[in-house]
């Protein structure tokens, strides 16, 4: 059996710096974080953007991991180049092949901590289940979004995003750092347990399945002319029912939620999503039965069968 | 007597947009905001930066109002040019001379609402006293800071900054908009009362006098290697006593407040101040007797004697 290697990424967005702090702390005092002897590689996702104090230089790095991007290095696109580089260094067929990628993010939305999975890969769902079972975190299943693709973790056989908020861009915050550390350690501990076949998977997984994102209200010229209603602001994960308030418009009109079935909003008023025309995303909360295939996929991956 | 004219500025920093929203709302429905018949000019301070979604293009506009800047237009400095333009348009000797400037800002720090005065000008202190008497807001006296000069309101005979937080950069927030509106209306109402000589000034003014700003801890290479301690985060306006925790360093060390006299911190972890090497500012809370000269200066100004 080859040695299991795990890629840890922080600063995929250059202005989300709390995970980077944790890596620096860890470098200084290796005892601070317990990885249970599993080999890890800690990298800053987008060091150029970090230096510039920006989310990205040319394109969002976490939308740059598309198959076609890896064909050639493009000197005019810092992020496509970095995506290729990371895959060449730590991808499954790279210099230091990693089987699992964990990508640490922050949000300006009042989401607390959550795990994001991209699509329904068995090993991802198994690992997310283990974390939900340990920490009770919501799991956000991001799928069916044609406008947003090419996420970093998708380039690894198994990968999760950890998303923590609220925190302003470019700021360090003691609470966010502690929460990041807790989730990182829990992830490593759970991977270790699977490695030792000391398994305890839950029967159910609560999934917040992405349905769609909605834009802010806009005027005829395309300018935003409505803000998130006070009853919706900071109410991530709280169920929306028909006629609930969504936005206040410039003309005083209130825009309400008009769907018949309840949705759960997330990423409400996330600063980085204004440019993506996203005021919030809607999810459906679903209770899924844990599947044996998920468990087997994660075991096979970690044991590199 | 010439007509009193008041300059209202929002978006002096292009990513502080809640005041701009209020102006747009007001344009649409003029009854929404009561200015008591006083002539106002509403301007976006830095429209270029607003378009770019940034605090500024070349330099902070609210540090660009220096006498020497007004000598000539500099096409390579968008903000110096804009500062001259605003003074030419609305300055005391401008096309539409305004006697009072009110400048609406937001902060990512948990400051709530406050009034900022730059230096100890009589009319500013009188107007700030009226607002404190109505709304109980803290008044932050910014002075003795050689590194920060050239503030917009200093170019008008009387001028206050309204600062409201916490809110992420570039975001609209219903609470911030409501608070901005309340303070704007209260300011106009109080100016109106002075105009009508219907005066009620308090006997005392509580001032938070700026003492100094402190930087984040840094390593030998100048990189930030400490974050605001969890006991200090979001504790703006709360008194610091000797040995209180200020920062956590990368090496685990806690940096404490070591002065003998108590200070009151403000702008704790303000995102825009990281580039200014400011982790927070220290003030002293002082109770000042209201002075007759302040009142007279404001009356004279508003009545244009």
From Swiss-Prot, chains A, B:
Belongs to the AspA/AstE family. Aspartoacylase subfamily. It is an enzyme of class 3 (hydrolase). Signal peptide: none annotated. Gene3D superfamilies: 2.20.25.160, Zn peptidases (3.40.630.10). One of its GO terms (cellular component) is cytosol. Zn(2+) binds at residues 13, 16, 105. InterPro entries: AspA/AstE_fam, Aspartoacylase, AstE_AspA_cat, Aste_AspA_hybrid_dom. The keyword Chloroplast does not apply. Binds 1 zinc ion per subunit. Its EC number is 3.5.1.15. Its cofactor is Zn(2+). It catalyses: an N-acyl-L-aspartate + H2O = a carboxylate + L-aspartate. This is Probable aspartoacylase. Substrate binds at residues 55, 62-63, 163, 273. One of its GO terms (molecular function) is hydrolase activity, acting on ester bonds. Keywords: Hydrolase, Metal-binding, Zinc. It comes from Prochlorococcus marinus (strain NATL2A).
